[in-house]
Curated annotation (Swiss-Prot):
Periplasmic-side segments: 45-74, 133-162
Domain notes: Consists of an N-terminal domain, which is sufficient for the localization to the septal ring and is required for cell division, followed by a linker domain, and a C-terminal domain, which forms the translocation motor involved in chromosome segregation. The C-terminal domain can be further subdivided into alpha, beta and gamma subdomains. The alpha and beta subdomains multimerise to produce a hexameric ring, contain the nucleotide binding motif and form the DNA pump.
Descriptive protein name: DNA translocase FtsK
Location of the region described as Disordered in the Swiss-Prot/TrEMBL record: 354-384, 434-502, 589-725, 754-867
Compartments in which it is found: Cell inner membrane
Family: Belongs to the FtsK/SpoIIIE/SftA family.
KW DNA-binding (keyword) present: yes
Membrane topology (UniProt): Multi-pass membrane protein
Free-text function comment from the UniProt entry: Essential cell division protein that coordinates cell division and chromosome segregation. The N-terminus is involved in assembly of the cell-division machinery. The C-terminus functions as a DNA motor that moves dsDNA in an ATP-dependent manner towards the dif recombination site, which is located within the replication terminus region. Translocation stops specifically at Xer-dif sites, where FtsK interacts with the Xer recombinase, allowing activation of chromosome unlinking by recombination. FtsK orienting polar sequences (KOPS) guide the direction of DNA translocation.
Organism annotation: Escherichia coli O6:H1 (strain CFT073 / ATCC 700928 / UPEC)
Amino acid sequence: MSQEYTEDKEVTLTKLSSGRRLLEALLILIVLFAVWLMAALLSFNPSDPSWSQTAWHEPIHNLGGMPGAWLADTLFFIFGVMAYTIPVIIVGGCWFAWRHQSSDEYIDYFAVSLRIIGVLALILTSCGLAAINADDIWYFASGGVIGSLLSTTLQPLLHSSGGTIALLCVWAAGLTLFTGWSWVTIAEKLGGWILNILTFASNRTRRDDTWVDEDEYEDDEEYEDENHGKQHESRRARILRGALARRKRLAEKFINPMGRQTDAALFSGKRMDDEEEITYTARGVAADPDDVLFSGNRATQPEYDEYDPLLNGAPITEPVAVAAAATTATQSWAAPVEPVTQTPPVASVDVPPTQPTVAWQPVPGPQTGEPVIAPAPEGYPHQSQYAQPAVQYNEPLQQPVQPQQPYYAPAAEQPVQQPYYAPAAEQPVQQPYYAPAPEQPVAGNAWQAEEQQSTFAPQSTYQTEQTYQQPAAQEPLYQQPQPVEQQPVVEPEPVVEETKPTRPPLYYFEEVEEKRAREREQLAAWYQPIPEPVKEPEPIKSSLKAPSVAAVPPVEAAAAVSPLASGVKKATLATGAAATVAAPVFSLANSGGPRPQVKEGIGPQLPRPKRIRVPTRRELASYGIKLPSQRAAEEKAREAQRNQYDSGDQYNDDEIDAMQQDELARQFAQTQQQRYGEQYQHDVPVNTEDADAAAEAELARQFAQTQQQRYSGEQPAGANPFSLDDFEFSPMKALLDDGPHEPLFTPIVEPVQQPQQPVAPQQQYQQPQQPVAPQPQYQQPQQPVAPQPQYQQPQYQQPQQPVAPQQQYQQPQQPVTQQPQYQQPQQPVVPQPQDTLLHPLLMRNGDSRPLHKPTTPLPSLDLLTPPPSEVEPVDTFALEQMARLVEARLADFRIKADVVNYSPGPVITRFELNLAPGVKAARISNLSRDLARSLSTVAVRVVEVIPGKPYVGLELPNKKRQTVYLREVLDNAKFRDNPSPLTVVLGKDIAGEPVVADLAKMPHLLVAGTTGSGKSVGVNAMILSMLYKAQPEDVRFIMIDPKMLELSVYEGIPHLLTEVVTDMKDAANALRWCVNEMERRYKLMSALGVRNLAGYNEKIAEADRMMRPIPDPYWKPGDSMDAQHPVLKKEPYIVVLVDEFADLMMTVGKKVEELIARLAQKARAAGIHLVLATQRPSVDVITGLIKANIPTRIAFTVSSKIDSRTILDQAGAESLLGMGDMLYSGPNSTLPVRVHGAFVRDQEVHAVVQDWKARGRPQYVDGITSDSESEGGVGGFDGAEELDPLFDQAVQFVTEKRKASISGVQRQFRIGYNRAARIIEQMEAQGIVSEQGHNGNREVLAPPPFD
């Protein structure tokens, strides 16, 4: 058979047939094509040439080249994101074809058809699900064309959620049709995987990792004495390990080399001298009789089996483990006393001299420095030396303990009945961790069952002691707090024989446990709270959580443990009796509640071990726990401060009153907390100064909850009553000394509620005066009961004492900052955190509030309102009906036209009409109002010429108008890719495409519309778009707001050159400064030889790169106070925004018209741009001079065609719908474009303004709004240089004729009306003529020239 197997392993090369050669070659090519396709899909770039884009000006980015770009674009267009799965599907198909290439089975065409149907269903539903739920990829729909068709079809019928569910159902059916898998099988497979993962995770968490390196724990100076003792014990442990190794080698002689007797070795409990079986596994390690995995009996099994390996053959390692457990327990709870390991008596059995089967028996009497070995008599005593330290420490408990000791004495003696002959004692130390705690749910019946088992003991020595078992007294034993009334039973005196000094084996793990036990005991001593006024403890309530096994000192556990144990169950009974002796105060009624951490189904029901790790001082300090010395110093400091507070010498009357109010508030909060529990504090505001303390407390609370749930929090308080199992002891439980870890972490669990206190800083100096809350916890250690401090464990779970943990946690934070905290009551006296008397709501956009500086260079789009994710689909059926209705209404007016196309938009829908031959478009324009009436719409706008089409447009409003959000317009490639810092967004056109304009190319903008038409919203959208595009060093603003409402919200942003101008006199000066700045920039640009500001800035940047800045060519030493020659710097664009241009014209008059005209004519090259907005589109405001220099205009809704012609030079604005609906006449274009303006809320404007305020303060330029040379700042002329050249001749004419009129000057000098009016105004300013009277006449004040 092996020869045949060897021949099969030889690999031979076989020739393929021609068909298979061709097939495999074809499959290889297809796989390579799939890899290439995946690379093309992953490297897709929208700028590459493709089906949707044929022109490009950059190199191809796609890894597949031009074919890859075309193919990727096509697949994305058709399938969307599902295109990424196509290469995977191709590779899977190739693999399937290769695997089934040799099968010549009959082809089931019905099955093939079902698979094809399943594939189609999977493709369609996957694309539909992607279209409904996934975001779009690049500029493609997420589900491609297929998904878009499905989503648009299903959403009107089933909505998005219903469509998703329907598509999921079809997808599931398609998967079954394609693969043939049943969903029941899929669910079972998934469940099996999940259970395997959970089983693996649970088995990993049950691993015993309690042994760690000694370096993990910090060694303190106070442990030097213990370290010397531990070294001495380690030497003995090494000697014993050598003996155990020899026994291991001897045991290996009985092991089958092939390992065929592994199962028998694992599950056997026989002695080593039994020839047929051994107690070792294949690895030579002794089998653990208490292991829940390898034990074959349950702890609650009532009958006795004389061939039971657990009860009939106890291994020799059991007394060693018992002694080790007792040693660890004793040292962990009696650290001040020298740790001693007692020796139980040796069983009287003949054994070979090379295998000393010595049982370790504790000798009664005072503790000695060295342990002794005593042979075990036939009835050895139950009182052991391990109980002596606890009894001496708790002297008041000796009387009530004695009557209870003989009560469970038979259970303690039962393990002695069987001598054992285990050949080796190599049990691992972690064996005792599996403590059989939960096998006795009922107090009386459980113990009776154990007594019945003990009657089957083969020895009669212990049968006479069954009279001491009183099941009837078991129930009141744990209910009555005075067990002294029971009659004690006299025990036989222990026989002390000659012993020789020796010690039980101490393994390395036991040494670690000893050190950790000493650390736990020392930490428990550290955290004894400072004594306070004594108060009687509250009575114990039955609803409290039962203390853990380690709550009672495990020193007593070894007293009742027999070295010749016949089973785990009887040893557990004995340790339960010792637990009753050690802790009578906590003996409460038993209960049958379920116990945690029990593995059922195999062996006795034993609890899982609990991992314990004692935190170091450094970790405790990180948790906020401090040492007793520090707490004592804090207590002294609090006492001194309390005395100082009581004296009241350093506080005035106001401070004392504030402290009294704080104390009343604290008492009220405490009362409310006691009434409503801990949840009351969650609603109280936290003081900002305690933010760090609150964070520490929260971290400590979370860590404590984790530790509590992991180690001792499996059973909530009050969930299960007390049971006898809570006080059971065993050798396993002795080493599992997890009792002190809960009191150690109690300071961590308790400060949970501290940050939520209403007056945390003020409460701290009042803590010494409130000893009532801490008394139930601090009084417990003062009682003369040894296990009393452990009884504090369930107290942190009581809801009626939430104040004590908070005060306890605040103490570590007081020593350093305690003195400043006494000044905290002065803070509530301050009415506002702001240093101002103004109300916070009166702050202009929160100008003085502290702001956090953002990290992004420009504001985030998250500040703006996002558009809704679900957009209502277009009702094509309704549009078809409207098209037929339009044709019918036109036919009513004898106009034959056909609707050839329609373009739905967010606000209006354009119907394209193909007029019959000979029909003029003017006829439809004249019928616009009649068509609106007949079609029952608000307004109808007729577009006579559509660029590029021979049709006439008819624009009708939609029934449901959609809002155009600024965020969706800004988040667009047209806006992002525009490099100009003056890019502004207007909204969307009738097709829903964003409209983006460049203010630098306009170069000025005139905005007009009636009140409420959306003019101010449009201006805000332009400003915000520039704030999202440019930095302050690129664009600066001069804002003129006569109404003091629209642009004043931008006060304080760093883009402003000066404060928002609200006085029209200052507005004229600002415009004049712009004219002077324009002239200065022209001089600088001419000196550098550039044509515009962009070229000027490029020259400056080039000089900076050369490290040779350009000096100012027009600077003179007397021009400024600079010591050095100033250099030229980068000049920003300046945008002058006037919100109400008509008010400026009316207030200042025609004087600013010249300034605006000059800026409109020349300021474009200098980088100064005007945005003029007005709600009065009349000819006296928008004059011909202004219109001639501002070609770019925006018209919102106006009242008449005349106003529309004033703005746009054509009609159409009167037919707009309002609320942002506008006509935009761009540069170099005479045809206006209908745009639906982006909507901007006030909250969005405030958010963006606050974001820019947080980035920096504005750097204002002095002298923009002030003009010292003009008279009152409104003259508009700078002395004689501004006078008209004909001024002197006109003055001579007026003084000679003695008549001053604008028409007379105009006729005399043949000039225009505006120039003649300015000359007369100049005469008025010079005092030559008087002001205009009520009849329009003026008087000549100057004398005649010849007088």
